[in-house]
């Protein structure tokens, strides 16, 4: 959501080209990008889409939730039960993000968002940066204030 400004900013890069560029140009990321490229091709085949047409980030993430292909294949869900796990359908995206977080340790009925809490750690699995996890938690806290003040 944050990376795409909640769907307002659209992807600028071919996911295939982004991953392939990493395979051939970035030795430290080559193995990872090769696996992600394979996962992209699996996703494209399953969804019957052209892998060259999927747009995403410079790093190869796509959709409103900015999933990398392996995470999308493993953890996306068809929340609205229309037969498609759609990275550009908010019902599927929010359901998939929730599933991703719970699969990565986000506890049920959680109210502890402190540094290094289980919720914080599950957010950090998405982007292995303390600053990123802190920013998401801060955003959550500000959003909660606005939501609860409106009632």
Give each language-model segment a name.
Residues 1-151:
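Catalytic glycan-binding domains that act on GlcNAc-containing polysaccharides
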């Amino acid at each position: 959501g944050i990376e795409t400004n909640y769907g307002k900013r659209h992807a600028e890069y071919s996911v295939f080209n982004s991953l392939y560029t990493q395979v051939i140009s970035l030795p430290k990321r080559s193995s990872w990008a090769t696996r992600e490229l394979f996962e992209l091709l699996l996703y494209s085949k399953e969804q019957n889409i052209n892998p060259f047409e999927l747009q995403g980030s410079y790093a190869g993430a796509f959709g409103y939730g900015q999933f990398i292909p392996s995470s999308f294949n493993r953890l996306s869900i068809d929340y609205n039960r229309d037969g498609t796990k759609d990275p550009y359908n908010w019902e599927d995206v929010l359901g998939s993000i929730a599933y991703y977080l719970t699969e990565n340790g986000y506890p049920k009925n959680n109210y502890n968002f402190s540094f290094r809490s289980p919720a914080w750690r599950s957010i950090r699995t998405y982007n292995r940066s303390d600053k990123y996890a802190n920013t998401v938690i801060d955003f959550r806290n500000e959003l909660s204030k606005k939501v609860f003040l409106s009632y």
